[in-house]
Swiss-Prot record:
InterPro entries: ESAT-6-like_Myco, ESAT-6-like_sf, T7SS_ESAT-6-like
Record Pfam families: WXG100 (PF06013)
Keyword terms of this UniProt record: Secreted, Virulence
GO CC terms: extracellular region; peptidoglycan-based cell wall; plasma membrane
Homology family: Belongs to the WXG100 family. ESAT-6 subfamily.
Description of how the protein assembles with itself and partners: Forms a complex with EsxP.
Biological role stated in the UniProt entry: Plays an important role in mycobacterial pathogenesis in the context of innate immunity. Aids host cell invasion and intracellular bacillary persistence. Increases host oxidative stress response, leading to genomic instability and decrease in macrophage viability. Also induces autophagy and modulates the immune function of macrophages.
Name of the featured protein: ESAT-6-like protein EsxO
SUPFAM superfamilies: EsxAB dimer-like
Organism field: Mycobacterium tuberculosis (strain ATCC 25618 / H37Rv)
């Protein structure tokens, strides 16, 4: 009986998570542009309220990016570790 694991799929999933984390920067910039375009709501684009919102938004996106990137790295590492273990166990049974 042969069991086939798709370790490449695990690595690809981790890479996809990391790529999506990278795409967050474009979304962040788009939101900042929208906030600045609606600057009147905040009392002007240069107002303290507007700048504080943009600063907090940046912090939130940074946390999300860091966590998603770290999770993607962990998924890739887990896939790599499983592949290495599977290879080592498989070769010991040969």
């Amino acid at each position: 009986m042969t069991i086939n694991y798709q370790f490449g799929d695990v690595d690809a999933h981790g890479a996809m998570i990391r790529a999506q984390a990278g795409l967050l920067e474009a979304e962040h910039q788009a939101i900042v542009r929208d906030v600045l375009a609606a600057g009147d709501f905040w009392g002007g684009a240069g107002s303290v309220a507007c700048q504080e919102f943009i600063t907090q938004l940046g912090r939130n996106f940074q946390v999300i990016y860091e966590q998603a990137n770290a999770h993607g790295q962990k998924v890739q590492a887990a896939g790599n570790n499983m592949a290495q273990t599977d290879s080592a166990v498989g070769s010991s049974w040969a």
